[in-house]
UniProtKB/Swiss-Prot annotation:
One term of GO molecular function: protein serine/threonine kinase activity
SUPFAM superfamilies associated with the record: Protein kinase-like (PK-like)
Name recorded for this polypeptide: Serine/threonine-protein kinase mos
Keyword Kinase attached: yes
Annotated catalysed reactions: L-seryl-[protein] + ATP = O-phospho-L-seryl-[protein] + ADP + H(+); L-threonyl-[protein] + ATP = O-phospho-L-threonyl-[protein] + ADP + H(+)
Family: Belongs to the protein kinase superfamily. Ser/Thr protein kinase family.
Catalytic residues identified in the record: 143 (proton acceptor)
């Protein structure tokens, strides 16, 4: 049913692979069972599943998940997601890994094109639409940054990597100490940096 094809990347809580699942191309995230911080590993795995039942064009869709893993692997669980490619907004902004944006008559002298105004507006609208949907479902991402915005071959932005996300109780906000203070410090929400409550 599930066949790993090639690694796409790795991070603090696990590795991501391109794979096939029931014949369809998918992305598979294996959350590692960290011996240093087991609670954080578990929280990251379950946080990824905050969006498991949600479907939106600007949010990476979870297809399946399992806590079963081969004994030889130090994995807490496996999450199967739609495959949206391996290009992120980070690649596009900083010119890394974005083969499809190379240009001979580059504007910045770095061999890459600057984002056009149309692309900038389209990407911004996609991200805001995805965020508005997540917030309407009571989900806050808590690690929104260019590296977690995936861009499909059709140029659609999809928000991914929900390992730091929180599902807020209806009508309530959470104090910052309730949230796992994960995520990237330089991209942390202003209210968290100021010690205020998290709201959607």
């Amino acid at each position: 049913q599930l066949c790993l094809l090639q690694p796409l990347g790795s991070g603090g809580f696990g590795s991501v692979y391109k794979a096939t699942y029931h014949g369809a191309t998918v992305a598979v995230k294996q959350v590692k069972n960290s011996s240093k911080n087991r609670l954080a590993s578990r929280q990251s795995f379950w946080a990824e599943l905050n969006v498991a039942r949600l479907q939106h064009n600007n949010v990476v869709r979870v297809v399946a998940a399992s806590t079963c893993a081969p004994a030889s692997q130090n994995s807490l669980g496996t999450i199967v997601m739609e495959y949206v490619g391996n290009i992120t907004l980070h690649h596009v902004i900083y010119g890394t890994g974005d083969v499809w944006r190379q240009s001979e008559d580059d504007e910045g002298g770095c061999g890459r094109k600057a984002l056009s105004m149309e692309e900038t507006v389209c990407y911004s609208c996609d991200i805001m639409t995805g965020l508005a949907f997540l917030h309407s479902q009571g989900i806050v991402h808590l690690d929104l940054k260019p590296a977690n915005i995936f861009i499909t071959e059709q140029g659609v932005c999809k928000i991914g990597d929900f390992g730091c996300s929180q599902k807020l109780e209806e009508g309530l906000s959470q104090s910052p100490h309730v949230c796992q203070q994960g995520g990237t410090y330089t991209h942390r929400a202003p209210e968290l940096l100021k010690g205020e409550r998290v709201t959607a």
